[in-house]
Amino acid sequence: MSASETTPQSNHGIGILGGSFDPVHVGHLWMAESALEQLPIEHVRWIPAATSPLKPHGPVASNEHRLQMLRLALSGQSGLVIDDWELRQDSVSYTLLTLEYLQEQFPDRPLYLIIGADSLASFDRWREPEQILKRCHLAVIARGGDPPPDYSILDGMTDETQIQRIRESQIQMPQIEISSSDLRNRIATGRSIRFRVPHPVATLIDNEKMYRVR
């Protein structure tokens, strides 16, 4: 599956879920499903990053392995699409450039950028955040048990009307204590990742001896 895959045109929006997915886990899947249920979107577009400007060391697994894991995790699931555009750019993954690409692909579809509250807290460090806000709606994940997202960081970047729309696009989901870094540590120390990642993904990780200490 790649960016060349087409989806039916409609007036529904498109959810954008970017990340390293190193590895993809059930928390990511729950985020996407919650977005599908709560936002006016037709599908969630998973966009694995090459190298994040805020994570300059880059992913641990190769691009191909991360794509393989995503394909296995999303196989047969409706409303979930993989877009490898950022990987094919062979450069740092800036959200603004990805949004410009998606606007060219889907000029009449509103874009919803799905981010966590932690990403919102550092939004002022993103490249040209004001331009990002002109090209998409932010949809912030609010996890039960966590402090509510702090939208004050957006003050001065856009007007109050858009900030209110962003608040209304907030996605509710339970708190899930799973992270890719914890999973990599569990694998490196010989602990189980069962039920934390889809079974086919766990099988691939084991077969390819990924994330093991060398």
Swiss-Prot record:
Gene3D superfamilies: HUPs
HAMAP family: NaMN_adenylyltr
Job description of the protein: Catalyzes the reversible adenylation of nicotinate mononucleotide (NaMN) to nicotinic acid adenine dinucleotide (NaAD).
InterPro entries: Cyt_trans-like, NadD/NMNAT, Rossmann-like_a/b/a_fold
EC code(s) of this entry: 2.7.7.18
Family: Belongs to the NadD family.
GO terms for biological process, alphabetical: NAD biosynthetic process
Name of the protein this chain belongs to: Probable nicotinate-nucleotide adenylyltransferase
Gene behind this protein: nadD
Source organism (scientific name): Rhodopirellula baltica (strain DSM 10527 / NCIMB 13988 / SH1)
Segments crossing the lipid bilayer: none
Pathway the protein takes part in: Cofactor biosynthesis; NAD(+) biosynthesis; deamido-NAD(+) from nicotinate D-ribonucleotide: step 1/1
A Pfam family: CTP_transf_like
Entry's Gene Ontology molecular function annotations: ATP binding; nicotinamide-nucleotide adenylyltransferase activity; nicotinate-nucleotide adenylyltransferase activity
Catalytic activity of the protein: nicotinate beta-D-ribonucleotide + ATP + H(+) = deamido-NAD(+) + diphosphate
Organism domain of life: Bacteria
PANTHER family xrefs: NICOTINATE-NUCLEOTIDE ADENYLYLTRANSFERASE-RELATED (PTHR39321), PHOSPHOPANTETHEINE ADENYLYLTRANSFERASE (PTHR39321:SF3)
Keywords recorded for this protein, A-Z: ATP-binding, NAD, Nucleotide-binding, Nucleotidyltransferase, Pyridine nucleotide biosynthesis, Transferase
